[in-house]
């Protein structure tokens, strides 16, 4: 087993938590579950990826933040993931799974302490990406469009232009093309419903965007990453662990 590399830098962790809390505060009250414990954890991996588990824990790869040109793009992906949680898409997938409790157990076991607060690192099965490919976290195109539209509304209420989400999707898809088809894990779990940029842009024109937040901490996080050693990919991490005999 290897450790999922959580970023423990207090400033980066605090920044991501504050951004996540801002998005939760902007979400529709009627969709919030009082029993959910929302958390937002930065992960030191270079893949452009982010995902949320049923119940609220969200994980954002360093590569997602580094690929973003501005905070609104990161906020957009996080709002999209938060929308899956609020709309209970993972729970709905669980009811469709052949063995739903096994699926949930695999993911809960992979995340370990994350569901209940966790520590500095989470044990995961080597070669898997925290079970992100599991049925619970692989969404249909209908679910994707719902999360896009609700995510756009959350963004606007939090002070971000939803078109930033569309631009981030374009960045993710461009990365997929540049990698020769072996693109970000995020794309395989979040299929494009079609006309994504168009309908997000149309939704943005209908929404009133609140006063924009101070985004200086986004730039500070990017500078902090630039001063750190480059993040490894999941495959590179697995190879280094095998090489060290761990």
Regions picked out by a protein language model, each given a short descriptive name:
Residues 1-246:
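A Zn2+-metalloprotease active-site environment signal
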């Amino acid at each position: 087993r290897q450790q999922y590399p959580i970023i423990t830098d207090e400033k980066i962790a605090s920044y991501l938590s504050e951004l996540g809390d801002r998005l939760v505060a902007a979400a529709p009250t009627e969709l919030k579950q009082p029993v959910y414990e929302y958390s937002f954890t930065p992960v030191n991996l270079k893949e452009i990826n982010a995902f949320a588990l049923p119940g609220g824990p969200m994980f954002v790869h360093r590569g997602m933040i580094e690929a973003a040109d501005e905070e609104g793009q990161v906020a957009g992906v996080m709002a999209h993931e938060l929308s899956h949680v609020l709309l209970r898409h993972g729970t709905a997938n669980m009811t469709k799974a052949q063995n739903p409790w096994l699926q949930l157990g695999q993911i809960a076991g992979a995340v370990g302490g994350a569901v209940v607060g966790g520590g500095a690192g989470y044990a995961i099965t080597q070669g898997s990406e925290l079970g992100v490919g599991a049925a619970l976290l692989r969404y249909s195109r209908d679910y994707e469009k719902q999360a896009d539209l609700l995510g756009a509304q959350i963004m606007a209420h939090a002070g971000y232009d939803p078109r930033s989400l569309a631009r981030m999707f374009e960045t993710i898809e461009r990365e997929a093309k540049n990698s020769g088809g072996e693109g970000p894990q995020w794309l395989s779990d979040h299929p494009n419903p079609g006309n994504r940029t168009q309908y997000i842009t149309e939704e943005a024109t209908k929404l009133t965007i609140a006063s924009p937040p101070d985004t200086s901490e986004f730039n500070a996080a990017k500078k902090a990453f630039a001063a750190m050693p480059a993040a490894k990919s999941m495959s590179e991490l697995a190879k280094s662990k095998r090489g060290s005999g761990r």
